[in-house]
Amino acid sequence: MIRSLRMQPNRKLYFKELPMPSTPGPGEVQVRMAFASICGYDMMMLRGTAAYPLNGYLGHEGSGVVTAVGENVRALHPGDRVTINPYEPCGLCDACRSNRPEYCTNPSSGYANLMTEYL
């Protein structure tokens, strides 16, 4: 079991016990989280001035160490240090078509629950 920091609708924080993530599937990696920041948006949610996060997830900026890789993963290996970007670029806007997905103007909204032990 692993622990994940969550927020209740009444804005109180708690740890939720979750099963250890399964072995990564094709194209997936498993990451042991090392750091996850509390950003301004997290603070707004905690203060009640921003929408309650989906499933009470907190954290969308973090880093960790790859612990396992699935089939067809070539660029990452166990032991590699990584940062996590929970947003999926749209692939259609000018930035994405110019190979600059970090400037995507229509990313998916992603709260990745980075305040956890493993992804």
Outline where the language-model segments fall.
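Glycine-rich beta-strand-centered segment in the early N-terminal region that forms part
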Residues: 21-36, 46-97
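Short structured motifs
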Residues: 16-18
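Conserved Rossmann-like nucleotide-cofactor binding loop
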Residues: 39
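NAD(P)H dinucleotide-binding glycine-rich loop of Rossmann-like/cofactor-binding domains
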Residues: 13, 90-119
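Extracellular beta-rich ligand/substrate-recognition surface
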Residues: 6-13
